Curated annotation (Swiss-Prot):
Membrane-crossing residue ranges in chain numbering: 86-106, 130-150, 287-306, 319-336, 771-790, 801-821, 842-864, 917-936, 950-968, 984-1004
Entry-linked Gene3D superfamilies: Calcium-transporting ATPase, cytoplasmic domain N, Calcium-transporting ATPase, cytoplasmic transduction domain A, Calcium-transporting ATPase, transmembrane domain, HAD superfamily/HAD-like
Quaternary structure annotation from Swiss-Prot or TrEMBL: The sodium/potassium-transporting ATPase is composed of a catalytic alpha subunit, an auxiliary non-catalytic beta subunit and an additional regulatory subunit.
Organism: Gallus gallus (Chicken)
Renumbered residue ranges of the record's region Disordered: 1-31, 214-233
UniProt PTM comment: Phosphorylation on Tyr-10 modulates pumping activity.
Role played: This is the catalytic component of the active enzyme, which catalyzes the hydrolysis of ATP coupled with the exchange of sodium and potassium ions across the plasma membrane. This action creates the electrochemical gradient of sodium and potassium ions, providing the energy for active transport of various nutrients.
Name of this protein: Sodium/potassium-transporting ATPase subunit alpha-1
GO biological process: intracellular potassium ion homeostasis; intracellular sodium ion homeostasis; potassium ion import across plasma membrane; proton transmembrane transport; sodium ion export across plasma membrane
Record bears the keyword Phosphoprotein: yes
Residue numbers carrying Phosphotyrosine: 10
Length: 1021
């Protein structure tokens, strides 16, 4: 419904050959897009770049040359995808699936009305009413569904918002600001902190430039950009900046190497908009159900058509019967019931932070068997936090919990005081203004992720960092850069008995240690010997192995005789020591798991759902988080773990021995789909790290090849192709990019993985409850059809009219059917294996046999019993009714005799007949009471389940009140031909109602006592 309706569906295939060619071409294009990005611009020297693009590296392109290229390549914009026109979407709601069945019913009614009006001149207008009502039902529910989904699917508009509006280019040696659309390949472009990158650039010079690539690669840390070629992979090299990512700080100059759809982001956009999502599982279920119902209807219709010809009815009468039976088989109220049930669940999920954009997704989520989850922000808190420190030669654990309820460490050590001072001073991050009342962890910080983690940690442990910085004013600093890999600052020190200047430094641990010759232990300076270096190395490896980002810290008190007050420090010609410093300690940071995630992953496991982590982050970090949240459970080893334990090379380990598996994106690149299938099949716990957007898509397709129903979570633009392809895409509401929200079917308003599990639970519950609603609704079909069949076979007066059937289907049955959507789960639905879409259908043969063959038959008996009682009370005994139909329905015969010889006029006979219709209708309501109560459960006893569902109790009262109103309201005899009943006639169907209840309770008892037995196999739906 809401998913990727591409252009191909609606274009008439002019010639099948032409159509096939187009399809092949489209498939070729999609395969091309799925391939990894290949380019060599990052490997070229500046001279080669100049030759390739003809750009003067100082003067840029000439205006004339830029105009030529613009004419050749077109503007630097993204092509919007072929969108489905709104009227097509609306028509799909009106004529798709179940609606089609009702339309056919409606047309058949008009046809029957037309035939009778030609034959009789003064036709019965029942068929006309029925046709109009059926059409109205379809139109109303169609509008309702369309309105629900009109809020979705505007993918490219959000891509448009990402296009930078202005770009600063150098042309003819002059800087000029132009519209980003006018940027061409070969242009020389300047960017500064705060700008969006206007196209894919090869950087030729940069000063402290960092870009935020998170929307593209999923890396949360800002990435340094410089002219150096640092990696074969263009996505990871330092000298390429990508279209629509943000420059966070610094400046850079680059040559444009691709524009518009040819950029990396453009390729992802084309990939996302070109993908077609398949049919949702619930749409397939409803299709299966329609086939079943239509099969039953046509079978009955044709059988009785032939039978009526054998019974010597005319051709036309037989056709009218055929139409009547097919229409009577259509459950008019069911379309509305299903739509309302799904909407109610969607509303309930919205209260639990799951916003469903596409109603059918509610059902899909329940049948999910694999969840491919992004790591950053979904499984983790999306904020770097200090996790461990190493000082005084031991590792201390910091508190990473969201509410600061975790571990604490000894803060009295003199070394910790020195370490916290360095972390606070050698740090450019600051809290934004006016946040005194906000909890420290929730405060907004200006600065990069690692520095803000240190800032919050020191603020929590040691009080105000702002005051600390005021006590030690900064004199000079050297910011972090990629060549020396450290950051250094010198501060005034007013503490008595200490030197006047304090030098503090932090950076990559091995680089910091190389600059030190002593170490601070328990506040005492000691020489740095081999033993301490080994201890440092072990701590560094241990913290790095936990997937944490480790920084080293050192300081030096500058001697007053060399550096008196007012000394002019020079950072260009460094005139102060940067060697022989005193090492203080390490601090390591990680983006920690969310508190609710391990529990949610555990729930998924017990529900038989496989959780796979797919992330752009490092394998070590990914594996650490996977272990932390339980995606890799305790005791399960990867191939590398087994190799390390047995001390053998990885190549000698049999991959089948390892339950868990961490796959690197570069390995995935060279895998065939068979190898990927092998991994997905034989490993229960899988982590994919360093993956590209195209690979996410390939992983989703791999899972779907195994027959899994896949849910994918993601927040970046890089996730949108996978979100679109998945059976259900789940985007993040807070951190998610607009694009990912458009591609998804569901949005998590709190970005929390645990909300997906709630969604799965709701989805499973609504699937169970829809079964119950459908079973309840279908049962009354039999007491509605059998009167018509007996009317044909036994030639008796019609026991139940068309108007009364409509009053049941669209009146009394609606609220009770919807109330079953509020029913609680019978058992722990999260302890079940996921539903197998091939075998466990929404409506299966067993449900049909229960509703039609068993409960429905008892209901029909109740109705006929009431009919015969009323006829007998009026003088027509059952034996006298058989074969009376032709006389009874002839308006010119006014002397039909009953069993006692009394004569009845046409008018009097019809009043008795319509009273019977009303009584039959009331009997169906009475037996539907019992049906509603037994449909509450499929296995448990009603006494176990209880009557806690208030809506259902209201439904019982509502249908009874409506039946009484229709029977006793003055004027109903004219409007709907319904007549008042004697109170005793209400009780005729009571025994049958009780029989239904007892029959079903005994059936369920046998199922519970004898699981897997014959009764369960034949009757458990």
């Amino acid at each position: 419904m809401g998913k990727g309706a591409g252009r191909d569906k609606y274009e008439p295939t002019a010639t099948s050959e032409h159509g096939t060619k187009k399809k092949k071409a489209k498939e070729r294009d999609m395969d091309e897009l799925k391939k990894e990005i290949s380019m060599d611009d990052h490997k070229l020297s500046l001279d080669e770049l100049h030759r390739k693009y003809g750009t003067d590296l100082s003067r840029g392109l000439t205006t004339a040359r830029a105009a030529e290229i613009l004419a050749r390549d077109g503007p630097n914009t993204l092509t919007p995808p072929p969108t489905t026109p709104e009227w097509v979407k609306f028509c799909r709601q009106l004529f798709g699936g179940f609606s089609l069945l009702l339309w056919i019913g409606s047309l058949l009614c008009f046809l029957a009305y037309g035939i009778t009006s030609v034959m009789e001149g003064e036709p019965n207008s029942d068929n006309l009413y029925l046709g109009v009502v059926l059409a109205a039902v379809v139109i109303i529910t169609g509008c309702f569904s369309y309105y629900q989904e009109a809020k979705s699917s505007k993918i490219m508009e959000s891509f448009k918002n990402m296009v930078p509006q202005q770009a600063l280019v150098v042309r003819n040696g002059e800087k000029m600001s132009i519209n980003a659309e006018g940027v061409v390949v070969g242009d020389l472009v300047e960017v500064k902190g705060g700008d969006r990158i206007p196209a894919d650039l090869r950087i030729i010079s940069a000063h402290g430039c960092k870009v935020d690539n998170s929307s593209l690669t999923g890396e949360s840390e800002p990435q340094t950009r410089s002219p150096d070629f640092s990696n074969e992979n263009p996505l990871e090299t330092r000298n390429i900046a990508f279209f629509s990512t943000n420059c966070v700080e610094g400046t850079a100059v680059g040559i444009v190497i691709s524009t518009g759809d040819r950029t990396v982001m453009g390729r992802i956009a084309s990939l996302a908009s070109g993908l077609e999502g398949g049919k949702t599982p619930i749409a397939m279920e409803i299709e299966h159900f329609i086939h079943l119902i239509t099969g039953v209807a046509v079978f009955l219709g044709v059988s009785f058509f032939i039978l009526s010809l054998i019974l010597e009815y005319t051709w036309l009468e037989a056709v009218i019967f055929l139409i009547g039976i097919i229409v009577a088989n259509v459950p008019e109220g069911l379309l509305a019931t299903v739509t309302v049930c799904l909407t109610l669940t969607a509303k309930r999920m919205a209260r639990k932070n799951c916003l469903v954009k596409n109603l059918e997704a509610v059902g899909t989520l329940g049948s999910t068997s694999t969840i491919c989850s992004d790591k950053t922000g979904t499984l983790t808190q999306n904020r770097m936090t200090v996790a461990h420190m190493w000082f005084d030669n031991q590792i201390h654990e910091a508190d990473t919990t969201e509410n600061q309820s975790g571990a604490s460490f000894d803060k009295s050590s003199a070394t910790w005081l020195a370490l916290s001072r360095i972390a606070g001073l050698c740090n450019r991050a600051v809290f934004q203004a006016n946040q005194e009342n906000v909890p420290i962890l929730k405060r907004a910080v200006a600065g990069d992720a690692s520095e803000s983690a240190l800032l919050k940690c020191i603020e929590l442990c040691c009080g105000s960092v702002k005051e600390m910085r005021e006590r030690y004013p900064k004199v000079v600093e050297i910011p972090f850069n990629s060549t020396n890999k450290y950051q250094l600052s010198i501060h005034k020190n007013a503490n008595a008995g200490e030197s006047r200047h304090l030098l503090v430094m932090k950076g990559a641990p091995e680089r910091i240690l190389d600059r030190c010759d002593s170490i601070l232990i328990h506040g005492k300076v000691q020489p740095l010997d081999e033993e301490i270096k080994d201890a440092f190395q072990n701590a560094y490896l241990e913290l790095g192995g936990l997937g944490e980002r480790v920084l080293g810290f050192c300081h030096l008190a500058l001697p007053d005789d060399q550096f008196p007050e007012g000394f002019q420090f020079d950072t260009d010609e460094v005139n102060f020591p940067v060697e022989k410093l005193c090492f203080v300690g390490l601090m390591s940071m990680i983006d920690p798991p969310r508190a609710a995630v391990p529990d949610a992953v555990g729930k998924c496991r017990s529900a038989g759902i496989k959780v796979i982590m797919v992330t752009g982050d490092h394998p070590i970090t990914a594996k650490a988080i996977a272990k932390g949240v339980g995606i890799i459970s305790d005791g399960n080893e990867t191939v590398e773990d087994i190799a390390a334990r047995l001390n053998i090379p990885v190549s000698q380990v049999n991959p089948r021995d390892a339950k868990a598996c961490v796959v690197h994106g570069s390995d995935l690149k060279d895998m065939t789909s068979e190898q990927l299938d092998d991994i997905l099949l034989h490993h229960t716990e899988i982590v994919f790290a360093r993956t590209s957007p195209q690979q996410k898509l390939i992983i989703v397709e791999g899972c779907q090849r195994q027959g899994a129903i896949v849910a994918v979570t993601g927040d970046g633009v890089n996730d949108s192709p996978a979100l679109k392809k998945a059976d259900i895409g789940v985007a993040m509401g807070i951190a998610g990019s607009d694009v990912s929200k458009q591609a998804a079917d569901m949005i998590l308003l709190d970005d929390n993985f645990a909300s997906i599990v709630t969604g799965v639970e709701e989805g499973r519950l609504i699937f169970d409850n829809l079964k119950k609603s459908i079973a309840y609704t279908l049962t009354s079909n039999i007491p509605e059809i059998t009167p018509f069949l007996i009317f044909i076979i036994a030639n008796i007066p019609l026991p139940l009219g068309t108007c009364t059937i409509l009053c049941i289907d669209l009146g009394t049955d609606m609220v009770p059917a919807i109330s079953l959507a509020y029913e609680q789960a019978e058992s722990d639905i999260m302890k079940r294996q996921p539903r197998n879409p091939k075998t466990d259908k929404l409506v299966n043969e067993r449900l049909i046999s229960m509703a039609y063959g068993q409960i429905g038959m008892i209901q029909a008996l109740g109705g006929f019993f009431t009919y015969f009682v009323i006829m007998a009370e009026n003088g027509f005994l059952p034996s006298g009714l058989v074969g009376i139909r032709l006389q009874w329905d002839d308006r010119w015969i006014n002397d039909v005799e009953d069993s006692y010889g009394q004569q009845w006029t046409f008018e009097q006979r019809k009043i008795v007949e319509f009273t019977c219709h009303t009584a039959f209708f009331v009997s169906i309501v009475v037996v539907q009471w019992a049906d509603l109560i037994i449909c509450k459960t499929r296995r448990n006893s009603v006494f176990q389940q209880g009557m806690k569902n208030k809506i259902l109790i209201f439904g019982l009262f509502e249908e009874t009140a409506l039946a009484a109103f229709l029977s006793y309201c003055p004027g109903m005899d004219v409007a709907l031909r319904m007549y008042p009943l004697k109170p005793t006639w209400w009780f005729c169907a009571f025994p049958y109602s009780l029989l239904i209840f007892l029959y079903d309770e005994i059936r369920k008892l046998i199922i519970r006592r004898n699981p897997g037995g014959w009764v369960e196999r034949e009757t458990y739906y």
